Amino acid sequence: MADLKPYIAKAASGEPLPLGDAKAAFDIMMSGQATPSQIGGFLMALRVRGETVPEIAGAVASMRSRMIPVIAPDDAMDIVGTGGDQSGSYNVSSCTAFVVAGAGVPVAKHGNRALSSRSGAADALAALGINIEADADTIGRSISEAGLGFMFAPMHHSAMRHVGPSRVELGTRTIFNLLGPLSNPASVKRQLVGIFAPQWLEPLAHVLKELGSETAWVVYGDGLDEMTTAGTTQVAALENGQIRTFEITPEEVGLRRCSPAELKGGEAAENAKALLGVLEGKDSAYRDIVLLNSGAALVVAGKAENLKDGIAQAVQSIDSGAALAVLQKVIAVSNDKPA
């Protein structure tokens, strides 16, 4: 039986693990050969010392080698936050996904239940009536027929069951928060990724480039793992093989600045109700932050020339009823009913 202890000792000593060692360590954890205490110790040793790009790449290689894939169009994208920002905000990326799909871009949305927050993507979507445990074929059909499919991480990364209890007990972000956006079961090449800390912007953009992404924006919104209308958003953009960094304020793209309190979410049922309100056209700070993120996603998808154009398309997606229609179709298809 393989032993995680040498890798724990190495990480705890402050020594970075080469990609091969990182993959080997994650292979041990993902195959059920490590105890919960060992997993927790290893994850926190990495976090305290600071995870490196080779360690993330090795962990992703281990996860990808075990995942159950989903077939999606070549131009599909993912819109995902790492979680772990401790903000308790609304499910911005989930709502954004429906708006982007309503604007004509296929979305293969990867997400999980809450691990370090009150309501994760899966919690809110399940509360809306989506069958989050649909199989890979049904999800592929949902993407092609409804424009969006939701991939519940534990269904596609079943090896994660070995580390899930340790993550919940730790109750804080770990390297696994970084891995979700990098381990999309549909192997999308375009991503809008929200990150929990600004020091990860450029490293994650480099990891995405190494993993074959064509276009991606990695964003940090002043305490949020999404673009924010309550402050300044920092962006590391992978475009045409190059990575550039810049900042965005809501005012410069014609949106209202709000207070962080206006973006506070609640439990899954409350967040689901708020998400539905946005798709039904209700005006709110939640709508504005969704418009900002949707505009950016449409730029990443190549559908919009710039952020203002993307926001205009997002407004049209909501106000025409297209985004709400996507939600209704996804609910139907995920529950094996005609769209």
Swiss-Prot record:
User: Which GO terms label this protein's molecular function in UniProt?
Assistant: anthranilate phosphoribosyltransferase activity; magnesium ion binding
Catalytic activity entry: N-(5-phospho-beta-D-ribosyl)anthranilate + diphosphate = 5-phospho-alpha-D-ribose 1-diphosphate + anthranilate
Give the keywords, sorted.
Answer: Amino-acid biosynthesis, Aromatic amino acid biosynthesis, Glycosyltransferase, Magnesium, Metal-binding, Transferase, Tryptophan biosynthesis
Cofactor note, please?
Binds 2 magnesium ions per monomer.
Protein's pathway: Amino-acid biosynthesis; L-tryptophan biosynthesis; L-tryptophan from chorismate: step 2/5
| Entry similarity comment | Belongs to the anthranilate phosphoribosyltransferase family.
- The name under which this protein is listed is Anthranilate phosphoribosyltransferase
